Amino acid sequence: MKLNLFASLRLFAIILMSLVLSSCGAMKPLPSDTFYRLRITAPTAGDTSRTPWTEHLIRVVKFRASGVHRERAIVYSDDASLVVQQHRHHLWVDSPERMLQQELIQYLRSTGVAPLVSSSESRGDGFEIRGEIRQMDQVMQDGGTRVTVGLAFELVSLSGQPRLILAREYQKSSVTNGKELIETADALSAAIEFVFAQFVGDVDELFDK
């Protein structure tokens, strides 16, 4: 009787272990993370005839952002922008605050607005640019997706007492070519490039007066 009970328990344990191993084998592997860069093309200094903004340094500080826009996960929202979520496995290569700082530095260097554009501290004359990310979203809507970028800029003169020269907000929305995240990253890059061009154009106009 004891032998039969032992054999039954052993058979039950073997069946249970087989079921556990079978279920483990059927589990889907965890999704891997995918990383995205911004791709922004700046005009070269030779493409434009502009008056330099300053003969001194322009410092671009790290952008400000709040909540989800400080994190690396790509943000998406509904059409009304009331519900904001994150693509947990689709990430920017760096935080949006730092990415936009570096992209704006490269953009301004290419346009020739100053002899030196940097993120370094400036103690002399020149300008400081402060940016804020208001929106940088993939927007889900009926029939497709679009992107919306909202950025605010302040241009501050560092000659003598710091003085605000310009404060302006910009927004750009556009429809994406598809629902893949690589297409969203491309569309966000194009929207940011458009906003950078608007900001630079507004400052050019300010100094051309």
Give, region by region, the residue ranges found by the protein language model:
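Extracytoplasmic/secreted envelope proteins and their assembly/folding machinery
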Residues: 97, 101-105, 189-192, 196, ...
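A structural "domain/chain start" motif
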Residues: 24-96, 206-209
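Generic short beta-strand segments
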Residues: 63, 132-136, 171-173
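Sec-exported extracytoplasmic/periplasmic mature domains
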Residues: 105, 109-113, 200-208
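Short secondary-structure boundary motifs at beta->alpha junctions and helix caps
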Residues: 81-91, 160-198
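Sec-dependent bacterial lipoprotein signal peptides
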Residues: 1-22
